[in-house]
Amino acid sequence: MKRLFSTVVFLATTLAGMAQITPEEKLNMTLYAVINLYVDSVDKSKFVDYHISNMMKSLDPFSEYLAPESAKQGEMLFGDNIPQSEGKTQTLQHKTDAKTNAPYCVNAAYMADNTTGYISLSMFGQSSADEVRESIRELKKQGMKSLIIDLQQNGGGLVDKAVEIADEFLSKDLTVFTARGKNVPEKVFKTSRKGMFERGRLSVLIGSGTKSAAELFAAALKDHDRALITGTRSFGKGLIQETLPFADGSALRITVARYFTPKGVCIQKPYIPEQKADWGVKPDIEVAPDTLHRSSMWYNIITFSGVQTLIARTYAQEHETELRQKYTTEEDFIRHFDSLSIFNKVLAKSDELGYERSDDDMAKCKDYVVLQLKALVGRHLYGNNCFFRVMNERNNALRQALASQTEK
């Protein structure tokens, strides 16, 4: 007891007697006092974890402390099993490269009209640059003079691949973006060679689903006046984070830098209300997406449960032979196939599952679901290009970009 009292007196005297104390010293002394002097026992691990977590949260919405169990949990990968989805073990499906097992990044590449190519890029993955180059080569063979790149649902990916693909459209030695932070060296990412499509009209489609590396790519083409940007403002995700592991399996994920466009705009959307800085990528031509179907509760329910995909796949499998005989080409299918009868099967399945719907629901989403079913059957018969050719009938940004491409 006497020793404890002496320790308390010594610590109090030391703290009071220090003319200056650094924040780090204050933090260490506070931790020492709580662990060693508090009246009740303290679980050191829980106490430290709790306060580290709160410290990280106070920095920004993205810096965080990862407890050991959280740090071990990686992102779900294609091919991972999902236990007990509707009573059965499911496996994530995605078209992958047979050699690398990496997901394909180009969803579709086709001629949108006689001279305009269209490429839908879902992510900036390991194979994305090679896929884009191959798509450009094939489209050029088909007479492509201008190109539209669709990034509306591109969530980003590897920034070095964004630079590599931008290099196909920009002249040599141009800044694509800059990474800058107070405690890390500034790094400027530049083009380094002659690209495949440095001339010819270029449009990039963006929206709220355009994030991170996709925003950097679009901003570079915009800032260098290389592409016309069409759609809605991008998401605004432009932070660089590092993960610092601890020996116990926990880790800190901390923001260390920000990405800036060639004209110096920070991509990151402000997360402090009073900040009024510019952010993201603003389109040159603002075009709102077609989202009316999403306001239908019934549509959201059947989409979540996968009713359209199930019905369309079953129909395509059961009628594949007769469909291929009737529609001998992809073009013939797109022009003449009517999916209204399949829509009636969706309604019947919905009723069987007890999903309620109103006339208002139908008014909001019927036309979209009918088109979606046609696209899904088309994908089964002719592949992804057919799916996108059908669904892009409702792609407002694409329609505007095509109109802009033809303007003198």
Regions from the PLM with identified roles:
Residues 1-21:
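Bacterial Sec-dependent N-terminal signal peptides
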Residues 7, 67-70, 339:
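Helix N-cap / beta->alpha transition motif
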Residues 7-8, 98, 191:
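Composition-driven detection of intrinsically disordered, low-complexity segments
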Residues 21, 28-111, 390-402, 408:
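Extended, small/polar residue-biased N-terminal targeting/export presequences
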Residues 21-31, 104-148, 152-408:
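C-terminal "post-core" interaction segments
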